[in-house]
Structures are given as C-alpha cells and as structure tokens.
C-alpha cells in the first residue's frame, strides 16, 4: 500500500517564504498608493475651497475677507474676526468634509485637549492655513492692490491657502505640501 504524497516541511517553508517576500514587496507599494490618494483628495478639496474663495471675491467686489487665521488662539484678537470656514462655508454647498485633509493625522501637543494631542483640524476646524499675508492689514482690499500681489503680478503665483503641515512627505521636499493659488489651481511650490 502506498502512502499519499504530502508536502514536506521544506516545501511548506519555501512557500511561506515566497508569500512573505511578496507581502514585503506589496506593502510599501500600497502605502505609496494610499499617500498619493490622500494628496489627490487634499488637492481636490483645496480646489473646492478655491472656487468658494472666488465666489466670495465676486460677491464682495473683489475684496479680501477678514478672517482669523488661528481661531483657537487664546486670547482671541480684540475684534475677533470669523474663521475662514465661517466666511467661505456658505459658498460650499452642503460639503463640510472639504475642510479636512485625509492626511491630517499629525498630532501636536495641545494643553487643552484631554488626550494631550490633537490635529490642526481638531484645533482650528480646517487642515489648511489661510495665507497670513492676505489677512489683517490687507483684509477688505482688492487682491490686486496688496503688496503681496504686487510682488508677483500674477494670480498664478499668489498663494491663498496651503496645507498647514507637510502632510504628504518630509518638510521642504517637493510634493510635501499642497498650495492653492489665486487662480484656483492647486500645486506645489517650485
């Protein structure tokens, strides 16, 4: 009588090793794909914010909004202007998720948070920073009259919003931060 043929221990270990090797190759690729997906989602959301900003500018005779760039700041400024979310949300029909970048998972120490850490979105209500060069002294002015615009003379070079943190890579590296420009395109700083 012949015994049924079975896999030997060596054959099973070889198969397990090959599967482990394939997983080792695929996981970094999947991680890069997820990061690229998050960057694209953030860029699309910034583009939506850019369209809302353009609609606001059209309604306000091309004058820049007065916004508080850090609403969580304590104490608030004396006049305490509204946040960018409060100013632009009426122009973003029903979508509230545009204010949070899916890659905004960087946690910073925060004494007010029960856990001790929170994201920029948790503190400020958005993952993007309104360009401080356009707020305060330039608020209420037409964009083209600001010193910031006069430096570049092009809507394609004037940054309106940007990722608060380098969500998409190491700081200073190309592709680590999305920037929304005044012409509503989203890109990287060259």
Task: Describe every region a protein language model picked out.
Residues 40-190:
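Short, well-structured segments within or immediately adjacent to enzyme catalytic domains
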Residues 2-44:
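Amphipathic alpha-helical segments typified by the pilin-like N-terminal helix
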């Amino acid at each position: 009588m012949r015994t049924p043929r079975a896999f030997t221990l060596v054959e099973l270990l070889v198969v397990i090793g090959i599967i482990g090797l394939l997983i080792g190759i695929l996981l970094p690729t999947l991680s890069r794909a997820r990061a690229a997906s998050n960057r694209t989602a953030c860029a699309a959301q910034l583009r939506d914010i850019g369209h809302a900003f353009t609609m606001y500018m059209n309604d306000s005779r091309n004058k820049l909004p007065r916004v508080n760039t850090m609403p969580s700041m304590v104490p608030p400024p004396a006049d305490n202007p509204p946040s960018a979310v409060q100013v632009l949300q009426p122009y973003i029909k029903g979508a509230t998720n545009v204010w949070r970048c899916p890659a905004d998972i960087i946690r910073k120490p925060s004494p007010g948070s029960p856990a001790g850490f929170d994201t920029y979105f948790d503190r400020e209500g958005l993952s993007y920073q309104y360009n401080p060069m356009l707020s305060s002294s330039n608020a209420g002015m037409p964009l083209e009259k600001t010193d910031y615009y006069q430096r570049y003379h092009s809507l394609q070079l004037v940054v309106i919003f940007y990722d608060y943190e380098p969500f998409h890579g190491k700081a200073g590296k190309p592709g680590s931060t999305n920037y929304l420009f005044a012409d509503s395109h989203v890109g990287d700083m060259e």
